[in-house]
Amino acid sequence: MKNYYSTVNNVILTHSDMLLENHARRVYVRFERQNDHGFDFAEGLLPENTFTKTYGFSEDELFELQDYLRCNAPLIWEFAQEGGGMFAKSAA
């Protein structure tokens, strides 16, 4: 699953290629940031735009990450169909 998408405020977003599971197209996503003891993370799915596992992010931060994911979903879908990496971007 390691197609890099972006880094914003030291939070990295990676995603899988597009997968076909039970006749449905899905993309797995993972947000992560380094902390003093390892990593905070939030793992989820598109098109559901939901998180399945989280650790270390506050509820407000998770809301912001979910909003970021919703706003960027069309690009992530496109990149996931094309294999991701070469289209990735970085923002400070």
Model-derived regions, located:
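Structured catalytic/translocation cores of nucleotide/phosphate-coupled proteins
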Residues: 3, 39-42, 63, 90-92
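Intrinsically disordered, low-complexity segments enriched in small/polar residues
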Residues: 2-3, 26, 66
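Acidic, low-complexity intrinsically disordered segments
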Residues: 55-92
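A short, structured beta-strand/loop element
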Residues: 16-58
